[in-house]
């Protein structure tokens, strides 16, 4: 299992320390829809708030594709979908872009 798959497993369990552990400290996560660029702590905070409000619902990974230093995850988050492209370096996520619909 790679860091992107562990990330989504942690998100599904609301295991915020496990989520944090998947990222390099300087990682930046871009949200393609609004152009937001989040640091790891901002990313965690957004997911914590959404989970606390019940906005995330059940999380299910539908597809995972890994090719060397990149991983692509398609996930269902409640009624929403996310496709994320994750750059992997030394077993952790160095950067990512997520597309939400």
Task: Specify the residue positions occupied by each region the protein language model found.
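A solvent-exposed, acidic/Ser-Thr-rich amphipathic alpha-helical stretch
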Residues: 16-18, 25-65
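Alpha-helical interaction segments
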Residues: 5-7, 13, 33-37, 89-90
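Short acidic-aromatic low-complexity motifs
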Residues: 1-26
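A beta-strand edge to alpha-helix "cap/lid" segment located at domain peripheries
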Residues: 45-101
């Amino acid at each position: 299992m790679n860091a992107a798959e562990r990330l989504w497993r942690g998100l599904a369990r609301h295991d915020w320390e496990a989520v944090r552990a998947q990222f390099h400290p300087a990682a930046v996560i871009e949200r393609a829809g609004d152009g937001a660029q989040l640091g790891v702590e901002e990313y965690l905070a957004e997911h914590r708030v959404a989970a606390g409000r019940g906005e995330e619902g059940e999380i299910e990974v539908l597809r995972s594709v890994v090719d060397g230093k990149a991983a692509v995850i398609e996930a269902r988050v409640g009624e929403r979908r996310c496709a994320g492209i994750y750059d992997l370096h030394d077993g952790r996520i160095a950067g990512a872009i997520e597309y939400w619909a």
